[in-house]
Amino acid sequence: MAKTSMKNRELKRQQTVAKYAKKRAELKAIIANPNSTPEARWEAQVALQKQPRDASASRLRNRCRITGRPHGVYRKFGLSRNKLREAAMRGDVPGLVKASW
């Protein structure tokens, strides 16, 4: 089990990313636009750098919803491999069955 502080930190990062997503996309569009002036690009880069580090989506980490485990997490279910297996064996995941051949 991950520490509660790690889970809370990740939750705070998700909220920060959501808060700055629109403004960040606008600034990145200005930077990527070949028709924008060099001054506008420079101002956009400076404004982007002044945003919090955690506003970047690349700082997010997928964690298991139950345990908070950072590795071996299936995106489709939001569970780590261990908890997904347990849930599948109990029949909690509709349509997911153990393979047999």
Swiss-Prot record:
It holds the Pfam family Ribosomal_S14. The gene is rpsN. It comes from the Bacteria. Binds 16S rRNA, required for the assembly of 30S particles and may also be responsible for determining the conformation of the 16S rRNA at the A site. One of its GO terms (cellular component) is cytoplasm. One of its GO terms (biological process) is translation. SUPFAM superfamilies: Glucocorticoid receptor-like (DNA-binding domain). One of its GO terms (molecular function) is structural constituent of ribosome. Belongs to the universal ribosomal protein uS14 family. Keywords: Ribonucleoprotein, Ribosomal protein, RNA-binding, rRNA-binding. Part of the 30S ribosomal subunit. Contacts proteins S3 and S10. This is Small ribosomal subunit protein uS14. InterPro entries: Ribosomal_uS14 (IPR001209), Ribosomal_uS14_bac/plastid (IPR023036), Ribosomal_uS14_CS (IPR018271). PROSITE patterns: RIBOSOMAL_S14.
